Amino acid sequence: MLKYSFRALCAAGLMLMASALAAQDSPSKEFAIVDLSANMIREVPDYAGELGDQALMGTVVEILERKGYWVKIRTPEPYVGWVNEMGLAVRSPEEIDRWLSSPRYICTALLTRIYEEPSVSSAFISDLVLGDILLKVLKANGEPLAKKGFLAVETPSGKKGFVRKDELLDFRAWADERLRTQESDPERFRSDLIRTAACFNGVPYMWGGTSTKNVDCSGLSRTVFFANGILLPRNASQQIHTGEDITIPCEGELADYSVLQKGDLIFWGRKATEDKPEKATHVGICIGGGRFIHSSQLVRINDASTYSRIPLRGRRIVGQVDKKGSGIISVRRSPWYFKQ
């Protein structure tokens, strides 16, 4: 496989995203790494502005514009919105290359903290959520620095601390394993998706939420799949165009969900008419047995037979990742997460 730097990928328009994001060559192009556990992305540069998305710590973003202490960014999904400048570590393309090549950890706990010392009784530096990415702190011999059941870490902005060892995995090894399982053992991978989704049960709904703190409907599907090494677009209206289309037979007010497999996405919304196109406004994840999990007021499980809304269609993600035209890319093969 040819090796490309992050700068070269930007210049050549080879940023392989879920929606085929391409960046144009520009000597003034700026990048940053998210430095908060779940950075709030707003539609306008104002704290009163609508929340549109969240970006997780360690995620590389492109800087598009500045207005006061607000910065307009583009995320890997891609999603464009405004964040506070203090939630970013601004870096040159060369520094981004080094970040993408450096040994890193991914947080596998739903919620945890970075501590100043290897002890839960010490002061904490930052909170963490599932999917946050941190630099490894290494000893002189290149081995990870570990103390008393904790691993030493560094945030994108350079703050150092400790996280419990059982709450982190090597990022590259994790991404390799997720990709390998998805390709070689899809049934196990589907079960992994459902186990991850079940961890969100009871999490409050929040419009724009895309973390274990709060999620909206598409934020749940996006976060569950990311936690298993797959990048989905941000919104339901985009996710409905990814993967393989699955027609859900409907007769009157009854829908036959038996055509779906675990891990398939189910979409509801406005059916196409002569005047208006189809529009997905809600999404859930099939968990088998005629049930699905979704975020509606809070994350919960519903039985399809008692759910009154008629679905638009299903989409099969597993087995379609990294395929041309699928609109889906694995974390391991994304140049926003690893130097390819």
Functional labels for PLM-detected ranges:
Residues 1-10:
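Bacterial N-terminal signal peptides that target proteins for export
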Residues 121, 178-184, 204-212:
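Second-shell loop/turn segments in exported
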Residues 65, 138, 269-270, 296:
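Conserved "cap/hinge" positions at secondary-structure junctions
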Residues 34-63, 107-142, 205:
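Beta-loop motif signature
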Residues 205-219, 223-260:
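Catalytic cysteine-centered active-site loop
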Residues 24-29, 59-62, 75-106, 119, ...:
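Boundary regions of SH3-family modules and the immediately adjacent low-complexity/disordered segments
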Residues 17-20:
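N-terminal signal peptide c-region/cleavage motif recognized by signal peptidases
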Residues 112, 119-124, 179, 254, ...:
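Aromatic- and glycine-rich peptidoglycan recognition patches
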